[in-house]
Amino acid sequence: MLARLKAAFTAWPYCLATYVALIGAGWLLFVPFEPVRRDPTVYPAGNPQLAAETAAKALDGRVWAVSHTGSMKPLLQGGEYAVTVKEYPKVKLGQVLVYNATYHNTPIIHRAVDKDRHGWLMAGDTAKQSESWARVTEQNYLGTVVAVYRKF
C-alpha cells in the first residue's frame, strides 16, 4: 500500500495524474462556484405596474406582482412587477421562472439551477442549496421572467 502511494506521487506518469487530480480537487474546494445567471432586464419606471402591463400586452405575456420575501435578492427586492412569457420548451439554465409549487398555494418566482428527468430544479438566489422539493414541469410552469419593472 505504501509503495503504491509513493509511486502515485513519484513515478511517471502516475505522478502527473495524481497532481492534476489534487489541483482539480483543490480548485473545486477553494474557488467559489458561481451559478449560471440569466437575469431579466430591470427597468425603472414612474408607474411600474402600468409599464409592466404595457410590456406584457406587447409580448402577449402576463404580469406578476413580486412580494417582499427576500428569496431573490438582489435581483428582486419586492414591490416590483415581473413580465413573463410562456415558452417552456425554451427554458434555459439560470433563467428566472414563475411556477406553482406543490408545497405552496401561490405562484413562486425562483431561478432554474438544474434539470433532471423530473423537471427543472429551482432555488432562490439567497438559498445556499437548491430547494429540491420545487421542480418545474410543463404542468406547473407559469412563465419565464423577461422583464422586471420597479419604481425609480
Q: Which residues are covered by each model-predicted region?
A:
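Protein maturation boundaries and topogenic segments
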Residues: 1-90, 148-152
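Short coil-to-beta-strand transition motifs
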Residues: 101-110, 135-140
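A residue-level detector for short acidic-glycine micro-motifs
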Residues: 69, 114-116, 143
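Extended, hydrophilic extramembrane loops/domains of integral membrane proteins
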Residues: 119-152
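Short strand-connecting beta-turns/loops that link adjacent beta-strands
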Residues: 104, 117-118
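Short coil-to-beta transition motif at edge beta-strands of beta-rich domains
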Residues: 88-101
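Residue-level recognition of conserved beta-strand edge/terminus positions
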Residues: 84-85, 100, 144
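Short beta-strand-centered aromatic/proline hotspots
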Residues: 95-96, 108-114
